[in-house]
Amino acid sequence: VGLTLPRFLLRQPYSPEDNPVKTFVYNEDVSVTHEHYLWGNSAYAFATRLTESFAKYRWCPNIIGPRSGGAVNDLPLHHFESMGEIETKIPTEVLVSDRREYQLAEQGFISLTMRKGSDNAAFFSANSAQKPKFFGNSEEGKKAELNYKLSTQLPYMFVICRLAHYIKVLQREQIGSWKERTQLETELN
């Protein structure tokens, strides 16, 4: 399970000058509270990264990092006047710092991090909500803990699932037949 946050801006507020409605005149007032903006769940943005990765590569490990498939581009920016100055509403509900993104990732959250000075954001990690197990303080325990932690990250999980799917397809034709281990190894290699 992947839990994403924060919400992101789906569109600029409607106004006759900046973002007009085609069929009637409407001025959407967002000056009172930021809840009046149209926010979207970042799970949908994450789903676009998954589908784009699958469309390009036929599997889903390329979903994190701004240059490796994790970027959500062309998000709307709302420019407005406040106290005589032009301000810009960032496209994510809150600005998640690099440090906070790391802390959230360690707790199992997938955060959409706005890239400063741009109209895009990116997913920099994709940990699952599964808490890593503790295997002790020995060297073997630390290695096992790291291995378990890596196996709970979604990009690695998607690779393993795709390989398992591929092996299942290969072996589907062999259902009901009896083969030795060496014969199966030869077919898979």
Feature-to-residue mapping (PLM):
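Small-residue-rich
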Residues: 1-20
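Long, contiguous, structured domain-core segments that constitute the functional module of a protein
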Residues: 15, 19-184
